[in-house]
């Protein structure tokens, strides 16, 4: 009976981790520290405690969009342009920022490799007009082995750059001296000038993911072929919203807004890809959210 109680308690803990996950970064919670394994994936070497993505578009005040008849649309009426019109927009007046956050815990010493991170980004060899920018990159290792939490902030010495082809590069982040029990937090922004290209977002990983949330506020004149996974643990919705254009401080008029679609994709307690595929007997492919592209923001 005692053994049965312990098993039930472990299952209850796993459920609690999924429903009360700490989404604030900078200070792991007591629940994060108490996580020493997950009954649903007992062989897991590491676990993603929390992973979030927020995509926001920024339009300059003189941004212009055109419908397929090339007639100019004002900031007020652009929302009513034909759906999917993305060819006739002034791309130099629009940018988008991917704000990525992830917290991973190493469960076994053999899982230290999951502290590493690869960021693929667009960076042309010749014309860098539309190249991506990576900013606000922060990597912090939290160690609680002595009962007192110690923070270790990493700098640029822990990463290298590699060119993949004429258009893309990858930033390899390698975190050394990581052991079982350590928690690693990553945060960065990726600014893209390619408004009609949407990078993919991985809901599922090679290790368990307790909580992930993807939010995208996309102007309505841009329409992507969203591939939201059909999975019992994934919930998605889209709501009407808006993108506010910047204005001068002296401008007393109401700020101009462009109609947008606000997408939210959220999942809890996702099994590793291989284990999930095995249990579900190949009913559904590994979960991915994305548009036109093959980018894996986090690996």
What residues fall within each predicted segment?
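Beta-strand-rich, non-transmembrane domain signature
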Residues: 21-299
């Amino acid at each position: 009976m005692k053994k049965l109680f312990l098993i039930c308690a472990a299952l209850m803990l796993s459920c609690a981790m999924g429903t009360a996950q700490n989404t604030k970064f900078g200070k792991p919670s007591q629940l994060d520290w108490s996580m020493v394994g997950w009954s649903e994936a007992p062989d897991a070497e590491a676990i993603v405690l929390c992973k979030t993505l927020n995509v926001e578009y920024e339009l300059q005040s003189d941004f212009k969009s055109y419908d397929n008849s090339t007639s100019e649309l004002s900031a007020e009426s652009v929302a009513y342009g034909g759906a999917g019109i993305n060819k006739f927009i002034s791309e130099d007046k629009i940018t988008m920022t991917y704000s990525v956050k992830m917290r991973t815990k190493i469960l076994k010493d053999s899982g230290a490799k999951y502290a590493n991170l690869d960021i693929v980004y667009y960076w042309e060899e010749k014309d860098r007009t539309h190249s991506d920018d990576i900013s606000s990159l922060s990597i912090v290792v939290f160690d609680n082995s002595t009962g007192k939490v110690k923070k270790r902030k990493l700098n640029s010495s822990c990463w290298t750059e590699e060119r993949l082809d004429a258009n893309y590069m990858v930033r390899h982040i390698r975190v050394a001296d990581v052991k079982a029990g350590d928690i690693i937090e990553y945060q960065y922004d990726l600014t893209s000038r390619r408004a009609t290209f949407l990078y993919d977002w991985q809901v599922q990983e090679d290790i368990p993911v307790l909580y992930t949330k993807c939010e995208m506020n996309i102007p309505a004149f841009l329409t992507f072929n969203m591939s939201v996974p059909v999975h019992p643990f994934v919930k998605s919705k889209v709501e009407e919203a808006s993108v506010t254009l910047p204005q001068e401080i002296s401008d007393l008029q109401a700020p101009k807004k462009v109609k947008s679609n606000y997408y939210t994709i959220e999942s809890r307690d996702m099994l590793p890809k291989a284990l999930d595929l095995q249990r579900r007997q190949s009913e559904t492919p590994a979960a991915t959210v994305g548009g036109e592209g093959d980018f894996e923001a986090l690996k």
